[in-house]
Amino acid sequence: MFSGIIEEFATVVAIKKDRDNIDFTLTCSFVDELSIDQSVAHNGVCLTVVAIHQPSDICPQPSYTVTAMKETLDRTNLGLLKVGDKVNIERSMLMNGRLDGHIVQGHVDETARCIAMEDANGSTYFTFEYKDDREMARKGYFTVDKGSVTVNGVSLTVCNPTKNTFQVAIIPYTMEHTNFQDIRVGTVVNLEFDILGKYIARLQQL
């Protein structure tokens, strides 16, 4: 489980396709603290560390590798990553820590596309559009005003939701410390809807 509070960027240093899977090798400041089998969220996707590498000619810093399977690649924006891209990362929560964001499972539901950006006296409003699918909405894939949503792994508060769009306000600190700084109109992002809404939607069907 995660909280949606991004620790830092990881930078993609290598991408290797292995049949239907893709191995991503990345570097960050705390590679030395990682271990094999550890769960780390990448743009909101929970992935398992499968290898840790010492500095080499390919990457002068320590690095680590995670593997994304086909279902993950089909559902998320990870398949769009290129070498040099920045990825939001967060290690799984400690059970004795504060939940500063909201409950994030690391199970991305679908992608959305940025359709508008608006300056708001120092902050920035991003508008995202996702698939208008009534069946998915019945499963809890929707947003509510002042509710929580996870965008590229970042826990955010929803503004001005419609049936398939919503806005989020990004303060300068979040812009500086996440890959929201790279989002433009047309950029594809990962969405995880609030698990509480999904459970309520499911209960209504029983």
Go through each PLM region and give its residues.
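Conserved loop->alpha-helix
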Residues: M1-L206
